[in-house]
Every structure is written in C-alpha cells, then in structure tokens.
Amino acid sequence: MPGTGKMKHVSLTLQVENDLKHQLSIGALKPGARLITKNLAEQLGMSITPVREALLRLVSVNALSVAPAQAFTVPEVGKRQLDEINRIRYELELMAVALAVENLTPQDLAELQELLEKLQQAQEKGDMEQIINVNRLFRLAIYHRSNMPILCEMIEQLWVRMGPGLHYLYEAINPAELREHIENYHLLLAALKAKDKEGCRHCLAEIMQQNIAILYQQYNR
C-alpha cells in the first residue's frame, strides 16, 4: 500500500519521542546523561533513522542538547531556569484545573481515585520513581479534562524541560517524609468531586508549592 512505510516510520519516531519525553519528565534521565543514537536504536530494536529524528525533535524544543559523535545529552536544569519554569507552570496548571472542574465525569473521578490509591501505595512502599510517575499521571489526567489541548501541550513540555532536575530526588528524599504531602492530593480529589473550583485551585497550589520546595532543597545543598 503506497505510503505505508512512511507512516510506519513516522509512528516509530513518535513512539521514541514520547518514550523519551516520559523518561525526561519523571527524572529517569540524569542531567548530563549521554544518549548515543546507535546504542539507543539497538536497545529499542529499530533502525537509527527514527531514533535520530526523535532525538532531533527534542533538541528543537531544548529538551536535549547535541553532542559530538552522533550523541545527545540531557541538559542541566539550573536554579534560575527552574524558577522561570515553575512560575509559568504555576499559572498554567492552576488555569487547567479550574477549567477541568466542570468537565470531569463520574468515570474520570473513579480513574483519579484509582491513581490516588496507587500514589498512596507507592508512598507506603517507598518507591520514589513510582511516586513521581503516578503524580504525573494524576495531574495530567485532570488537566486534559480542561479540553484545551494547547494548554496541556505547554504544561507537558514544561515538565519535560524541568524533569531531569527530579532525578536528584530519587536518592535524596525519603518517601516516608511525603506522607503529609499525599494528604493534599486527597483534598484535591474531594474538591474536584464537589466541583469546588476555588478549592481545587487552592489544593493544587499547595501541592505545587510543597513539591517545588522539596525540589529546591536539593538545589540548595
């Protein structure tokens, strides 16, 4: 069928790009980490071309940097850059949660409840990677119900840009210390169920301020 090969190639590129974005956004890739095109292609079991194109796409949005010898690096996230990203995120995410309130269905709320239970379990197990991952899924599930795809795209891109800085939390934070922080997620879900727009904004603001404070502690060490 004409064009099938090209469509498959594009889908492979998008697959690699989305996978790398996810890894970047949860801090799975350490700042300064070197990604070699050939090695990555071998790990994924695909040709170099879609992998290289995916990496170049991430370079175009400053999520990766070009390095010599067909390699790319995960950029450092400086304190000043982190400040700027978090100030923008704060405004955009509070907007998204307020817009989502009226659009959440009973099924959406049930799915959020399941994610919150997974977040609680991850905290109790001390699984920092899972905490960060489920936090991301929980928040984005809410934001996407704003029905504003451009807004959500901007938020996700900012998470990709700041994500490498989260890597420092994996060994520096004891998940047991996050027990009180998880309570704010329960309060947020309760506000969502009550369709309390201002309550949702307040709860999310508390969550973001606490999470940002934890991250800044690592930068100030």
From Swiss-Prot:
User: Do you know which Pfam families this protein is assigned to?
Assistant: FCD, GntR
* One of the protein's GO biological processes: negative regulation of DNA-templated transcription
Give any GO molecular function from the UniProt entry.
DNA-binding transcription factor activity
* Phenotype upon gene inactivation: Disruption of this gene induces 30 genes and represses 10 genes more than fourfold. It decreases biofilm formation, increases extracellular indole, leads to colanic acid overproduction and elicits mucoidy.
Keywords, A to Z, come to:
DNA-binding, Repressor, Transcription, Transcription regulation
Q: Which domain of life is it from?
A: Bacteria
Q: According to the record, what induces this protein's expression?
A: Induced by LsrR, LsrK, MqsR and TqsA. Repressed by LuxS and YgiV.
Q: Tell me which residues make up the HTH gntR-type domain.
A: 10-77
DNA-binding residues (ranges) = 37-56
Spell out the PANTHER family in the cross-references.
HTH-TYPE TRANSCRIPTIONAL REGULATOR MCBR, TRANSCRIPTIONAL REGULATOR, GNTR FAMILY
What does this protein's UniProt record list under function? Important for biofilm formation. Represses expression of McbA by binding to its promoter region, which prevents colanic acid overproduction and mucoidy.
Entry's NCBIfam families? PRK11414.1
Stated name of the protein:
HTH-type transcriptional regulator McbR
Provide the species name.
Escherichia coli (strain K12)
Name of the coding gene = mcbR
